[in-house]
Regions:
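Positively charged, small/polar-rich N-terminal and surface patches that mediate targeting and assembly
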Residues: 1-89
Length: 89
């Protein structure tokens, strides 16, 4: 057995879950998290004032799979979570 931990963008969760179900992986633990990497946050406007948002919302997926499914699961997660933008990891 192997444990896979993946950090993805929140809006990709359904797509990743569906892709995992297609390869018969249905047990996933989902945790909401905040973090930053090269993105370093962003600025938002709220009621006329600017605020720095240092931490960006993320989703942490923890998945335990049989050894023979590990490579395929990692490939499926990588492909289905891909956006082509900074923060993909």
């Amino acid at each position: 057995m192997k444990k896979i931990t993946a950090i993805i963008k929140p809006f990709k969760l359904d797509e990743v879950r569906d892709a995992l179900q297609e390869i018969d992986i249905s047990g996933v633990t989902v945790t909401e998290a905040k973090g930053f990497g090269r993105q370093k946050g962003h600025t938002e406007l709220y009621r006329g004032a600017e605020y720095n948002v240092d931490f960006l919302p993320k989703i942490v997926l923890d998945i335990v799979v049989d050894d023979d499914k590990c490579d395929k699961a990692c490939e499926v997660i990588t492909k289905s979570a891909y956006t082509g933008k900074i923060g993909d990891g």
